[in-house]
Amino acid sequence: MAIAIIAEYNPFHNGHIYQLEYTKKNFPNDKIYIILSGNFTQRGEISLADFKTKSKIALKYGADFIIKLPFEYATQAAHIFAKGAIKIVNQHKIDKIIFGSESNDVENLYKLANLWNQNQEAYNAFLKYALKLGYSFPKASAFALEEISGQKIVFPNDILGFEYIKQIVANNYPIRAYTLKRSEEFSLKNPEPNIASATYLRQLVNENKSISRFSPMKFIHPVCSLANLYPEFQKIVRETSAENLAKIWLISEGIENLFKKHINEPNFEKFLNAVNSRRYTNSRIKRAMVYILFRIEDPSQFDEEKIQLDCWKNQGF
């Protein structure tokens, strides 16, 4: 018997320690597997710590086994991320997963996943309609789900958990999902006494502020970030034709022309704001930037271990 946690640990923090302790207490007979992203994340960010460091700290705090989520899944939209992660869970004959959930209503997530599975033709029609209107894929997906179910999934962890359960239901995997209550405040900039969201902690790290109250990890500047690689990104986009940029994975729908149009923005934040639109979310843009920076035409053939950035050195716990 085994249970899986699907994670990025960017960075690993006290909330993750609590999740591991909760899982060990409530599933004492199960080995805990972490399906862990590597050096790049689903939002298109460079991980603050590399895969080896994240693996070591997870093992220190209670995980039994670490399985790497391949780059081709780890740096994709939520539905592809979930597809890859749950596929790995099934391949390793792990019969349970547990994830944080704001609603903590796993039965409702199963209900919605079954509705989706039974109404895929209608769902896909609504999805295509919303995409034609210029919605981003996440918003189009939310629109389609609401049309077939009358419900909205609002919170980010519920959305990702729903994607996990969709994969379980669609593939009839012998996996049972469980949830761990995650408070809404956990995600805000008003952290609990010793727990804060990874988003907030990344902000503190980037501002060179201590996160010792919230995490056992320590970071030394400069830390890894797309902002620090923006000059290199500018150079590549300027020197590469739109035709050749379009050969890179995720560069489609004319986003290469949009990048060229705004490539003279003076910094990463202004570039992101200029390119962001109803169709292109920040995460979609950042994922495309990663693929351009490392010239990735086929993510299934990309060996991220060959990318060794100085900013990963001396980051640890």
UniProtKB/Swiss-Prot annotation:
ATP binds at residues 6-19, 100, 157, 182. Its EC number is 6.3.4.-. GO terms for cellular component: cytoplasm. It comes from the Bacteria. Keywords: ATP-binding, Cytoplasm, Ligase, Nucleotide-binding, RNA-binding, tRNA processing, tRNA-binding. One of its GO terms (molecular function) is tRNA binding. InterPro entries: Rossmann-like_a/b/a_fold, tRNA(Met)_cyd_acetate_ligase. The keyword Secreted does not apply. Signal peptide: none annotated. Coiled coil: none annotated. GO terms for biological process: tRNA modification. It is an enzyme of class 6 (ligase). It is found in: Cytoplasm. The keyword Disulfide bond does not apply. It catalyses: cytidine(34) in elongator tRNA(Met) + acetate + ATP = N(4)-acetylcytidine(34) in elongator tRNA(Met) + AMP + diphosphate. NCBIfam families: PRK13671.1. HAMAP family: TmcAL. Catalyzes the formation of N(4)-acetylcytidine (ac(4)C) at the wobble position of elongator tRNA(Met), using acetate and ATP as substrates. First activates an acetate ion to form acetyladenylate (Ac-AMP) and then transfers the acetyl group to tRNA to form ac(4)C34. Belongs to the TmcAL family. This is tRNA(Met) cytidine acetate ligase. The gene is tmcAL.
